[in-house]
Amino acid sequence: GLIIGIAGVLKAFLGPLLGSFSDKKGIRKKTLFYLVLIGFLATSLLWFAKPNEKYFLYAIVFSFISILSMELIFVSYNSLLKKVSDKNDYGKISGLSWCSGYIGGISALIICLVLFIFPTELPFNISKDQGGDVRSCMVFISIWLIVFSLPIFLYIEEPKRNMTQKNTFNYLIEGFKIITKNKRLLRYFIARLFYFDALVTIFAFGGIYASKVFNFSQTEILYFAILINISAALGAFLGGYFDDKLGPFKVIKISISGIIFSGIILLLINEKNLFWLASFSLGFFIGPLQSSSRVLLTKIIP
């Protein structure tokens, strides 16, 4: 939790600087490439982090680098939405991509379970001793990241550079001034800080809550993760359609209301069956919230 929190703070600081620099220089794809490479290396190097106290600091450092790079990847990745969509279908394309991402996450999780977690014998004669099953998952996920990033680098053109003569810092300050002058936009960015932190908390501690309060087994926690991803994928897909019809602001408001309602239900119930239903509802509203947040930024930022 602490690692995720620190990474979130650094993302809030580095994200605007990185975005301004890559936009001004016209190197969004190149920036994304280096971030993916860093994420790949940091995640794959977790293979060497054995369940032993002497590897604790090693695991913390590379886990932190992996998480931070993944967070920053989204900064460059989200900025490419305009290159693969038109103004009239931002919502549909964003929703479809979030849906695909969730399905990809589910697929990666299932493959890890089938290949490394459930079997008694692992591929390539890897031993389960010293956490070989979990460490193998780190290598697999790092390769998964590289493979499914390739279409971006092969088929999407580099966006045109911003022709402003201002340096990166002044360009960034100008962006902040635009935000502060627009009260509605300023309120949104403040709200975004809170609700995105809430989403990070949900993903980080959802499984812990299920384990401690409802006594979920490790297998049930995995099913819980799959359920959340399926419902979020469905919500993102449908939310993209409504985004183009109603606008991202309305979808965001509806999604936040749905998450709050589902969260309250989760806190009040004590039956497992109801927990599953409320969790599905929670995930269903998380998907469109993430998708429409990207669309809104795409529309309001030049």
PLM regions with names:
Residues F13-I27, G235-P248:
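Helix-to-loop junctions at the C-terminal end of transmembrane segments
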Residues W47-F62, L267-S279:
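Helix-loop junctions at membrane interfaces in 12-TM secondary transporters
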Residues S94-F116:
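Glycine-rich segments within core transmembrane alpha-helices of 12-TM secondary carriers
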Residues A108-E121, S142-R161:
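C-terminal membrane-cytosol helix-exit motif in multi-pass small-molecule transporters
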Residues E157-I190:
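Juxtamembrane intracellular "pre-TM" segments in multi-pass secondary transporters
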